[in-house]
Regions:
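Active-site microenvironments of metalloenzymes and redox enzymes
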Residues: 47-139, 234-240
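Outer-membrane beta-barrel "beta-signal"
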Residues: 229-231
Length: 241
């Protein structure tokens, strides 16, 4: 009888702890049919949720269209200022539908996070470097210099890592916030596989925009950084609907 009682208590204890664990959720976006799958990540400094994939053009284009629409210029998207049009095709001909958005500056990435926050009931941001590293657990495939055929690839077309997150390494590098300002982490389709991961941390340089013929050069787009993309995080969990 005592053994059965101990077993019953163990079952109850396990059942009671489950509700405290962060769970995955789908982020809907007001005024669109698009959703973002958000993956929970447990951290000693506080749980957070990270987008399962890099942000695709499908959603980034909605942001651009909304920001640049004449009907919304005065609205300002709740004080979010949008990027100016890019010179040339910012997708470089790699692909649009299902492909990661590329070439945006840190300023544009932060503006996108602000816009998404204004369309949801959560605050979104670029990950800190610490958050990115915690989410960069083992496993998962990667698009890199030797298998990418010199192009980005559609999101979620390799194996996810052990948390269920796609393309943390490779495909496109991703903006993170560091003590020294925004940087791009993780490596991209232009790097060899051994260079993918947190060791590849790039500081924006003038060379990323040297062929932009506009003067002044765009603060929103990089004419020569087709390897830059983004994903977002939030600390507002699945119950914050």
């Amino acid at each position: 009888m005592m053994k059965n009682g101990i077993a019953l208590l163990a079952i109850v204890a396990v059942g009671c702890s489950a509700p405290n664990e962060p769970t995955q959720f789908n982020q809907t976006i007001e005024g669109t049919d698009f959703t973002i799958e958000m993956i929970p990540v447990q951290s000693p400094t506080g749980n957070f949720w990270i987008s399962q994939t890099e942000i695709p053009w499908d959603l980034y284009d909605i942001f651009l269209q909304f920001i640049n629409s004449p009907d919304n210029l005065n609205a300002g998207v709740d004080a979010v200022t949008g990027p100016t049009p890019a010179y040339g095709s910012v997708d470089r001909g790699y692909g649009r539908n299902g492909y990661p958005a590329i070439s945006m500056s840190a300023q544009a990435a932060e503006s996108f996070a602000g816009w998404l926050s204004s369309r949801t009931n959560r605050t979104y941001s670029i990950p800190t470097m610490a958050q990115w590293k915690i989410a960069n657990v083992g496993g998962g495939g990667a698009w890199h210099q030797w298998n990418s055929e010199k192009s980005t690839h559609p999101i979620a077309t390799t194996e996810p890592n052990t948390l269920g997150i796609y393309d943390m390494r490779g495909n496109v590098g991703e903006w993170v916030i560091t003590d020294d300002g925004p940087k791009v982490i993780g490596g991209s389709f232009r790097n060899p596989p051994e260079a993918l991961g947190p060791e590849t941390l790039l500081t924006p340089i003038k060379g990323w925009n040297v062929t932009d013929p506009q003067l002044p050069r765009s603060p929103w787009w990089f004419a020569d950084a087709d390897f830059v993309g983004l994903r977002l995080v939030t600390i507002d969990g699945d119950s914050n609907e």
